[in-house]
């Protein structure tokens, strides 16, 4: 009974985590450009 809920949570968290990492990398890249690296 718990497995479908758990898999749903995991499937929901994976895209959010990937999106968060993408945003963090993008912001770091932008900051690096501003510093002239």
Curated annotation (Swiss-Prot):
InterPro entries on file: Cyt_6/f_cplx_su5, Cyt_6/f_cplx_su5_sf
Domain of life: Eukaryota
Keyword list, A-Z: Chloroplast, Electron transport, Membrane, Photosynthesis, Plastid, Thylakoid, Transmembrane, Transmembrane helix, Transport
Localization: Plastid, Chloroplast thylakoid membrane
Regions that span the bilayer: 5-25
Gene Ontology, cellular component aspect: chloroplast thylakoid membrane; cytochrome b6f complex
Protein's gene: petG
Assembly and binders: The 4 large subunits of the cytochrome b6-f complex are cytochrome b6, subunit IV (17 kDa polypeptide, PetD), cytochrome f and the Rieske protein, while the 4 small subunits are PetG, PetL, PetM and PetN. The complex functions as a dimer.
Purpose: Component of the cytochrome b6-f complex, which mediates electron transfer between photosystem II (PSII) and photosystem I (PSI), cyclic electron flow around PSI, and state transitions. PetG is required for either the stability or assembly of the cytochrome b6-f complex.
A Pfam family: PetG
Name of this chain's protein: Cytochrome b6-f complex subunit 5
Biological processes annotated in GO: cytochrome complex assembly; photosynthesis
Family from the record: Belongs to the PetG family.
HAMAP family in the record: Cytb6_f_PetG (MF_00432)
GO molecular function annotations of the record: electron transporter, transferring electrons within cytochrome b6/f complex of photosystem II activity
Membrane topology: Single-pass membrane protein
